[in-house]
Amino acid sequence: MKLIFIFLTLLIFVSSCTSILIKESSEEERIYPFNPVASPFDPRSLNQILKIGKIGYCFDCARACMRRDRYIRTCSFERKLCRCSYSHIHHTHG
């Protein structure tokens, strides 16, 4: 019985670490297109790309919080910071 419990505990631990690593690697593969040849020094193009990156990062942060049944508390694209609330989302049944 102890062996089964230890095995299941290790399995849960390994699977949670694996999912975190997979999520981080998939985030690194995201590329937001910026073509400096088309607009070499156009700050508006660069600002648009940064807005897309910020929106995408905070959207992913919100989805991660919702998967944990929590609200998003803080999202900072510049500092790569995503924090969820301590309280759970209250579901209303109508």
Curated annotation (Swiss-Prot):
Keyword Disulfide bond attributed: yes
Compartment(s): Secreted
Span list, region PRK6 binding: 67-87
Tissue-by-tissue expression: Expressed in the pistil. Detected exclusively in the synergid cells.
Keyword Secreted: yes
InterPro entries with a match to the protein in the record: DEFL_AtLURE1-like
Keyword annotations: Disulfide bond, Secreted, Signal
Disulfide bonds: C58-C75, C61-C82, C65-C84
Signal peptide: 1-19
GO biological process entries: pollen tube guidance
CDD domains: DEFL_AtLURE1-like
GO cellular component: extracellular region
Function: Pollen tube attractants guiding pollen tubes to the ovular micropyle.
Annotated family: Belongs to the DEFL family.
Quaternary assembly: Binds to PRK6 LRRs.
Protein name: Protein LURE 1.1
